[in-house]
């Protein structure tokens, strides 16, 4: 962007100023309408009894009212005869429930942050709609890839390769062996992970249990409090099963007497702790790639002490797993290459398809062909190629969801639980109906029915993971409550989390306190009931002082009193976080039980175990086997349609037309800033420079994320770009947001939940160490994370002048094009 001309810079500033003002305008209107009593400003059907409809020109939310009337009320699947019940009763009640649930109970409350992200995505979607439809008299320009600092991006992209350490010490977790450990009344099966180590020209093997990894991890955290220690993966007891017929190309596995009682062992080979081995291998790799840790005394001791001699069966097991690693890596690489190659080959046909889609009545023409043709083979060549492209992308998505991603197993287990409850037979019978309205109505009736006042299937499906999470959190709460030994403190923390008093709410709304300061405030403030006795206030003061001292010191504290006090304060912070999570989860369950509606997606479920012989063709064939049946269903539904699909196509084309053509009158952005004095103009210019740099950094982060991470099925991998449909691709990327970013406390809680029943395998939670690590992770945010947005005080002052430009233009457009707004 340094090479851009002054005219281009001005056009960029103008564009992002307009977009920012639209974002502020829509946020202002959304904040107004978040109060259920203000819904009347959306016009009919939001009309309370005894009141008349508020005219459009007197509405406080004209933009939202326009969007609601033009794009939401006109959605074809909504029954015109039940609009009043749907919006004025059901939606109003739902908004009341959501407004109660949209209260943050903690500073940096992770659950409130998740809700805020969804609301922000909705706000960005509306910003996308309006900023593209309202043009400016002056030239505008947005940041594209040519304006990014490409050399710097390439440097960031290959940064990890440049940071590889000399091969002084190498270690690979290659195998797993099983032993037994005697307990008082029973024997326990224990697994040791076999690690091949190369150090100072010597190569040998060591064996380490998961508990050894846990002790080692805790030692690193304590010995190097200012270093970023990679996370130890949670314990995973799952084994991997390979069908005998599918691993014929691999070396034979050794027979094991311990497997004779396994019902699956006759037809399948068992790889014990395979997923855990892979994750621990990555953990060791991350440590050895860290400048501060890779040759420390602790690492050398862990990886070089007590070498072992392996048996023939253990060496055979290692060889088998190594062959599997090679096949797995080649398979994944081949899948990506073939899927990408297929998609590129289809680009030429996709260009033709995109052009036809964006023409007038493009969607109508498309679905008319689906109605007239009885099978895929009868479709036009371009549409057949489009279906082939969709087949490849869907196959990639299936592969990515159930195998390729780190969370694939977790996703599979969640879907499997829902799969066990889902009434496939009932849904199959419903799908026999050809009329789409009948199909949708009967499916909703099935999902939302509450026989004898019991929970509906929809509520049960959504509550599965929430209820399990609440039970796990309750166990953790009991564990930490036992360490505080002060009922008064526990009661006060829980009361202020679940029902903050006025003083606490004011602090939360200002969002100026960190979590440890907020805990101190609610415990000692006289304005926050109930008041603690003086001896407890003195204790809290001493513990908070010790906590700050422990975090501010370079090394881990050595004074036992400081350690005891600071840990207790950390436990109180942990409890406050757990109380908040438990409260938020229960609020979510309550909201579901109140009848909140949503969409449920049913997925085909099969075994998630990694098959070393899976190729891309098998996934594509999986999709191909079902596509004819799916097309036949769509064709028959459309054939018997009574106008619903035609209305849907018209509705979609209405949105695309509005985005492409926009309003008749443009905005004069120079007029918006005319009222500013010279000092304010200079301040505005500084803010716009910051806004421009932030957008450049954000776009660079999105580019890095797109380039370094293979995500099949995302919009970024689709040949159809949003810009070609009149949609801002940058905002679409922003809508996807930081899905990979997780709250640090959530991750710690999740790890603790994994080990609730296995206390011996994990070191005791140390709040001092964890807080240091959290701060270190926050300071070392990767390059592909969107940076915080700069504060824009002067830009906000332009909002009234901007509204004076936008509202009359919108009112004129409404008067010329709309009948009932």
From Swiss-Prot:
The modification Phosphothreonine is found at residues 260, 597. It is found in: Mitochondrion membrane. The modification Phosphoserine is found at residue 761. Residues 241-268 have a biased composition (Polar residues). GO terms for molecular function: phosphatidylinositol binding. The keyword Amino-acid biosynthesis does not apply. Keywords: Membrane, Mitochondrion, Phosphoprotein. Coiled coil: none annotated. One of its GO terms (cellular component) is mitochondrial membrane. Disulfide bonds: none annotated. Residues 737-746, 754-766 have a biased composition (Acidic residues). It is a peripheral membrane protein. Its main location: mitochondrion. InterPro entries: LEC1-like, LEC1-like_C, PX-associated, PX_dom, PX_dom_sf. Residues 171-310 form the PX domain. The PX domain binds phosphatidylinositol 3-phosphate which is necessary for peripheral membrane localization. This is PX domain-containing protein C1450.12. It comes from Schizosaccharomyces pombe (strain 972 / ATCC 24843) (Fission yeast).
């Amino acid at each position: 962007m340094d090479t851009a001309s002054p005219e281009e810079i001005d056009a960029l500033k103008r564009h992002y100023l307009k977009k920012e003002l639209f974002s502020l305008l829509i946020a202002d209107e959304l904040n107004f309408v978040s109060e259920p009593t203000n819904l009347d400003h959306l016009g009919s059907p939001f009309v309370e009894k005894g009141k008349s409809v508020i005219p459009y020109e007197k509405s406080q939310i004209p933009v939202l009212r326009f969007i609601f009337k033009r794009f939401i009320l006109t959605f074809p699947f909504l029954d015109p005869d039940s609009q009043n019940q749907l919006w004025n009763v059901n939606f109003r009640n739902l908004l009341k429930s959501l407004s109660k649930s949209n209260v943050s109970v903690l500073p940096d409350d992770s659950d409130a942050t998740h809700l805020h992200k969804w609301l922000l995505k909705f706000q960005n979607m509306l910003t996308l709609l309006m900023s593209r439809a309202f043009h400016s008299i002056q030239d505008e320009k947005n940041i594209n890839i040519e304006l990014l600092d490409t050399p710097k991006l390439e440097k960031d992209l290959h940064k990890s390769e440049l940071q590889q350490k000399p091969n002084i010490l190498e270690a690979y977790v290659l195998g797993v062996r099983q032993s037994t450990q005697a307990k008082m009344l029973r024997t326990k099966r224990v697994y040791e992970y076999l690690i091949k180590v190369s150090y100072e020209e010597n190569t040998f093997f060591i064996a380490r249990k998961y508990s050894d990894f846990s002790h080692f991890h805790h030692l690193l955290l304590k010995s190097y409090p200012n270093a970023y220690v990679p996370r130890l993966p949670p314990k995973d007891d799952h084994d991997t099963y390979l069908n005998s017929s599918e691993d014929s190309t691999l070396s034979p596995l050794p027979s094991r007497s311990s497997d004779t009682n396994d019902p699956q062992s006759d037809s399948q080979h068992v790889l014990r702790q395979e997923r855990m081995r892979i994750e621990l291998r990555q953990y060791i790799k991350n440590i050895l790639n860290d400048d501060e840790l890779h040759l420390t005394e602790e690492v050398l001791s862990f990886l070089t002490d007590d070498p072992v001699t392996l048996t023939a069966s253990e060496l055979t097991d290692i060889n088998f797993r190594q062959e599997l690693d090679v096949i797995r890596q080649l398979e994944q690489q081949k899948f990506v290459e073939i899927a990408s190659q297929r998609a590129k080959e289809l680009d030429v046909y996709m260009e033709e398809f995109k052009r036809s889609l964006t023409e007038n009545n493009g969607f109508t023409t498309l679905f008319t062909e689906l109605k007239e043709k009885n099978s895929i083979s009868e479709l036009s060549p371009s549409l057949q190629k489009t279906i082939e492209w969709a087949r490849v992308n869907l196959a990639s998505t299936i592969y990515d969801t159930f195998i390729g991603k780190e969370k694939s197993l977790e996703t599979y287990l969640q879907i499997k639980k829902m799969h066990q409850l889902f009434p496939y037979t009932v849904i199959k019978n419903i799908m026999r109906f050809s009329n789409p309205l009948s199909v949708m109505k009967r499916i909703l009736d099935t999902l939302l029915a509450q026989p004898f006042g019991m929970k509906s299937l929809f509520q049960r499906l959504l509550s599965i993971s929430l209820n399990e999470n609440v039970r796990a959190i309750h166990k953790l709460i009991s564990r930490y409550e036992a360490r505080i030994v002060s009922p008064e403190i526990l009661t006060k923390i829980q009361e202020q989390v679940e029902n903050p008093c006025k003083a606490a709410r004011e602090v939360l709304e200002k969002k100026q306190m960190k979590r440890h300061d907020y805990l101190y405030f609610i415990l000692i403030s006289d304005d926050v009931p109930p008041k603690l006795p003086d001896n407890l206030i003195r204790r809290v003061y001493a513990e908070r002082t010790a906590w700050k001292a422990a975090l501010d010191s370079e090394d881990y504290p050595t004074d036992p009193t400081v350690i005891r006090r600071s840990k207790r304060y950390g436990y109180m912070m942990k409890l406050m976080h757990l109380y908040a999570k438990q409260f938020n989860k229960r609020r979510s369950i309550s909201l579901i039980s109140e009848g909140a509606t949503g969409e449920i997606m049913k997925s085909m479920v099969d075994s998630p175990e990694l098959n070393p012989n899976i190729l891309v063709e098998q996934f594509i064939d999986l999709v191909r086997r079902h596509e004819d049946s799916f097309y036949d269903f769509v064709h028959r539904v459309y054939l018997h349609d009574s106008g619903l699909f035609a209305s849907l196509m018209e509705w979609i084309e209405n949105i695309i037309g509005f985005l492409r053509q926009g309003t008749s009158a443009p905005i004069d952005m120079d007029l918006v800033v005319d009222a500013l004095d010279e000092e304010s103009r200079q301040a505005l210019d500084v803010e716009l420079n910051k806004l421009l740099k932030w957008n450049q950094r954000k776009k660079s982060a999105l580019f890095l994320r797109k380039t370094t991470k293979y995500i099949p099925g995302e919009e970024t991998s689709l040949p159809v770009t949003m810009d070609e449909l009149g949609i801002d691709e940058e905002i679409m990327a922003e809508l996807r947001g930081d899905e990979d970013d997780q709250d640090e406390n959530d991750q710690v809680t999740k790890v603790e939940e994994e080990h609730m029943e296995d206390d011996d395998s994990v070191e005791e939670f140390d709040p001092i160490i964890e807080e240091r690590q959290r701060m270190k992770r926050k300071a070392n945010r990767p390059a592909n994370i969107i940076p915080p947005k700069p504060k824009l005080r002067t830009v906000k002052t332009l909002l009234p002048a901007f509204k004076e430009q936008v509202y009359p233009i919108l009112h004129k457009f409404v008067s010329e094009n709309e009948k009932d707004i």
